């Protein structure tokens, strides 16, 4: 049995779909887990506003959920948006968040979520997709280097925000 076969077996149980209004409870559960993973706590109105934006067709912020088809559980999400840039004529897609539950990691869920975002970016006519990750998140970077390339850029943020 090759190293890829266990991932493939589990991968067949994963379905990724765009977030719908009925997914709010499942998404909220993952959103709280994600905050714990990121060692942060956000006010409840951030979750409420973010989810409302996902389902508002006038807002260019989308979410996708990964589900285990055997259990029906939501096991991961990706959030993405497109925006103008001075580097391309067409807009680009920024994957704002990517999260997979601890029990579902290294089973192909992250890859399926990224592939979903890539597919949606292609549909939008904005195939350039980028994201950032924590420098110490080596497990995720093992996947990222298979589906994208690492740049030499360093991210800076305004003080206090």
Swiss-Prot record:
Q: Where does acetyl-CoA bind?
A: 98-111
EC id? 2.3.1.36
One molecular function GO term is: D-amino-acid N-acetyltransferase activity
CC annotations in GO: cytoplasm; nucleus
The entry summarizes the disruption phenotype as follows: Sensitive to D-methionine; abolishes the formation of N-acetyl-D-methionine and leads to the accumulation of D-methionine in cells when supplemented in the growth medium.
Q: Which reaction does it catalyse?
A: a D-alpha-amino acid + acetyl-CoA = an N-acetyl-D-amino acid + CoA + H(+)
Task: Mention any additional remark.
Answer: Present with 1200 molecules/cell in log phase SD medium.
The record describes the protein's role as:
N-acetyltransferase that acts on a wide range of D-amino acids. Catalyzes the N-acetylation through an ordered bi-bi mechanism, in which acetyl-CoA is the first substrate to be bound and CoA is the last product to be liberated. D-amino acids are toxic for the cell and their N-acetylation, preceding removal from cells, plays an important role in detoxification of D-amino acids. In vitro, capable of acetylating histone H4 at 'Lys-8' and polyamines like putrescine, spermidine and spermine.
User: What name does UniProt use for this protein?
Assistant: D-amino-acid N-acetyltransferase HPA3
């Amino acid at each position: 049995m090759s190293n890829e076969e266990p991932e493939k077996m589990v991968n067949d149980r994963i379905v990724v779909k765009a977030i719908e209004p009925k997914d709010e409870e499942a998404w909220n559960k993952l959103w709280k887990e994600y905050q714990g993973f990121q060692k942060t706590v956000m006010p409840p109105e951030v979750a409420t506003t973010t989810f409302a934006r996902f389902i508002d067709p006038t807002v260019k912020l989308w979410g996708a959920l990964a589900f285990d088809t055997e259990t029906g559980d939501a096991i991961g999400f990706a959030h993405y948006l497109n925006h103008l840039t001075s580097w391309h004529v067409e807009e680009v897609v920024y994957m704002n968040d990517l999260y997979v539950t601890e029990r579902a990691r290294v089973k192909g869920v992250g890859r399926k979520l990224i592939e979903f975002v890539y597919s949606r970016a292609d549909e939008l006519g904005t195939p350039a997709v980028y994201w950032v990750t924590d420098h110490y998140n080596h497990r995720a970077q093992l996947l990222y280097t298979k589906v994208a390339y690492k740049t030499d850029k360093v991210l800076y943020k305004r003080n206090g925000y």
